[in-house]
Amino acid sequence: DALEAGDNVLVAAPTGAGKTVVADFAIYLAQERNVKAFYTTPIKALSNQKYHDLVETYGPARVGLLTGDTSINSEADIVVMTTEVLRNMLYEHSMTLDALRYVILDEVHYLADRFRGPVWEEVIIHLPQSVRIIGLSATVSNVVDFSKWIEAVRCDTTLVVSEKRPVPLEQHVRVQADDHTEPELIDLYRRDKDGNQTDKLNAQLVSRLDQLDRKAAKRRGEQRPDRRKGGKGGKWNDHSRRPERHTPRRWAVIDELNFLGILPGIYFIFSRNGCDQAV
């Protein structure tokens, strides 16, 4: 209703909660009204994925893609691009913007990024007033203030917030003494009597990790003092002297996830070099 009434819309909802339905409706309205819709993402990989998704729905003739090094059907009715590309188009006063009426800003929480945030800010400020903005995010900490700011620099903005997770987020810790012992997958948080996850750390996990630390210390000929006796100056306050916990091999983790039937999954490695070595 808000989009049909001409409002901007900001959607803050967990992953899988249906944020893209709002974006899809904006694209539908653009097609019905014979105007253009842009779909922006923060990275090329997301742009490429969204481009292929939209091509499946609307066909290659109606969908374009613009990233730093790719240009496909740039004058299409629906164009997917990185946010930086849209910012550059605004500063260049591109003719492509003439029929633009809807802009979907996916991952709009990037506005808070200290390095790239100004790009989102410039886009929101400099887009023509005839354009309606649809902001999508799963993580906006100050979503009410953000919505008010958009309304202040543009026009009426409808805020849609949902905190319910259609797919519950469950967190576990993989614990293993060494490559010769069976791994354990222990809940990070306690569960209540109904089996629901709470926000309190799982005492079983803390106890198991403490047990592994003591065993590791014993193997190194060190004796860990009882924490209940206190004391702040002991060698165990030196983090560099604490026994290192076992780091499982990647293939072993994947094998276990496969055995538990919870693949596919994403294995995060926080460096490009590490990713190259893992392959």
Regions found by a protein language model. Give the residues of each.
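Conserved P-loop/Walker A NTP-binding site and adjacent catalytic elements of P-loop NTPases
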Residues: 1-175, 265-268
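Conserved interdomain linker/interface between the two RecA-like ATPase lobes of SF2 helicase motors
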Residues: 125, 132-134, 139-279
